[in-house]
């Protein structure tokens, strides 16, 4: 691949393969990651998406975002991009293997928020902020990777790529790390990344995700993400004496009961505010979310508040209006029947007593 010699395969996916490579022209020693798109029927669309990713990466210069090094085309016409090679592990595995406590996890997460906010300032939405796309080096530096399904918010730039990538871009997502807007095909804004940051923080804190999604059917995914309210992270932590519960707590340098107490309250509210179904009710930005976490770390009041009972009830009725209406009608009929029966019995008793 040009001046690069492939050493091994790092991974493969729907768009193509990623290789570890090094310079082969003796100019200087450098290991890089090279992404090559698939050929075949979707080759044209994937080629356009890789060009878009190259354009996106070229705009980003941030210490916590893997930077673009080079790019080109192979003799068979397939495009490739050359990126900084990040020798690290997924952020959730890094936190667990290093037994980071909750405060350390929050500080690491704040660094990720800063990188995401920087991308947003450059009118770029990542759309795939899962743990495997955020690697942490041995030095503890997180690096945001894979802008392969990112979205440009600049209409003039986006218009140049829209027609070419439309068919390859239909609801591309990781289901358990997707926002309601992604699942339903609604317009994507920076708020979508804020939602997924909430999902990521949920897992870093509680050791599991907010939803268990085993089906690949879109209707099942929509039902899970768009209709069900996630449990607060503190309620996702088991306080039993199982090996799994102890393992999750110990990887956070605590015990299950203390972990629940730590998460309950402000941290629950921070995560749930980021994950609200309605984009306008989430944090206004990744930076605002990071700032609220800082308030928590400093022992100051946070802006996140738990939804009121009346609000949750109204949203439940809106989502399930048909069964609620039917149930309310049935309950009314039961009450009306019982009231009528009771009044009739009173009249019969009164007449008998006369």
Language model feature labels by segment:
Residues 90-100:
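AlphaC helix of the protein kinase catalytic domain
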Residues 22, 51, 55, 65, ...:
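C-terminal lobe helix-coil module of Hanks-type protein kinase domains
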Residues 12, 60-63:
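Conserved N-lobe motifs of Hanks-type protein kinase catalytic domains
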Residues 33, 81-82:
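Conserved hydrophobic/aromatic residues on the N-lobe beta-strands of protein kinase domains
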